[in-house]
Amino acid sequence: MNKILYPKAKITKAQVIEYYIRVAPQILGIVKDRPIVLTRYPNGVDEKGFYEKDRPEGTPPWVKTSTFYSETAKRNVNYILVNDLDTLVWLANLAAIEIHMPLGRVDAREKPDFVLLDLDPEPPANFANAVTVAGLLKEKLDDLGLRAYPKTSGKKGLHVVIPIKREYTYNTTREFAHIIGQYIAKETDLVVSEFSDTKKPNKVFIDYTQNSHGKTMVIPYGLRATPEATVSTPLEWQEVKKELKPESLTLFTVGKRKKDPWKDILENRQKLEVK
């Protein structure tokens, strides 16, 4: 338990476990019944981690799993479901620093309940530029009568997440995200909306491709494998400001936040028949 997982921040495995226990009430409802993908760092984040979809050998029998065919692995995979605190703690004990989830749940894997607008700044564009784009997105989504929830990616970008009714396929949600990105790209030269332009310098790509079967996003309140132990942090819209420093949202600070900006996200599933 005293093993150091974040050398720069001097964070131990015990502290990682304590953090996930603290934020579990905010995490569990959102990740329930989603087949998760892990990135594990048994030797700490300064060493190379490894990606894991399949439940590891020695998985306790009480850990819920879901088995289905993986197109990338070309075989059946036993995916872990983080449906309770014990499973979350067990994963933290495995040094599963990063936990990623799909936008759909196992009972209807092709019917996502979120649309993800992933704002990815290409240097020298930075987080402040992503904030500018997020503001434009909010204005457009407000005009369409859609409520969206922002969070930091835990690295350089922002996620704008729209909760939706489970009535649409990934083809529909991806097309919706693409159209929104194209609209914003016409409003400002800062934005690119086409996958072929993702590496254009000093641009923010509104990544619509994340709305696809098999794609994942880091869970809300999920740790990232950064030197500072940053967290993918749900935000109030009034917090989405250029002055915000994502590197300040860490294991040490996020667990102390008193409000959960995403507390009602599951109660606000919306139709994409926009107003």
Map each language-model feature to its residues.
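Short, conserved phosphate-binding/catalytic loop or strand-edge motifs used
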Residues: 153-162
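Charge-rich, low-complexity segments
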Residues: 1-92
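C-terminal accessory nucleic-acid interaction domains of nucleic acid-metabolism proteins
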Residues: 1-18, 28, 32-33, 72-77, ...
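Portal/gating segments that form or line small-molecule/metal binding sites
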Residues: 123, 128
